[in-house]
Amino acid sequence: MCSRRRIYSSLIVGGYAVQENGYARFTSNVDIVVPNVAEARDVLSIKGFRENPGSSMTVTDRISKVEVVLLPGGGSVGPGPLKLPLPIAVSPQPNIADLRTLVEIKLSSYLGSPMSRNQDLSDVIALIKANQMPENFELNSAVSPKYAEVWSELKHEERSSSGN
């Protein structure tokens, strides 16, 4: 995230990061983890983004109409077991969450609210397939059991559908 005077640390997560990590899917917004949501919202508002009434965490690009969801780095937005990473990398280019970070965020979000965060589990399944992720993919211990369960179920389905 940039302004004329300062470049801010940020991390792109969500559907856009899923696309950048190997699974193309449509998303109508961009989720960005920032160190300070209020400051980021103020900077983006000054840069021409429209503040969304009723939400302290979203702004909309006036030209493209893309909604930007600002997420609190080091904090959480739901009851999942992991906190969001605190972005420290500063770059004029977008910092996209790597595969490990993205899968951890998605699994944590799903575990915290499985009925309303089902897309997060679907994203993890798609990422496992698209990246041919191994069974022993190293993840935070708070989410690794769920990853192992999902990976095992996927392999079971593959074996069943291939007739083995």
Provide a role label for each language-model segment.
Residues 1-164:
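Compositionally biased terminal segments of proteins
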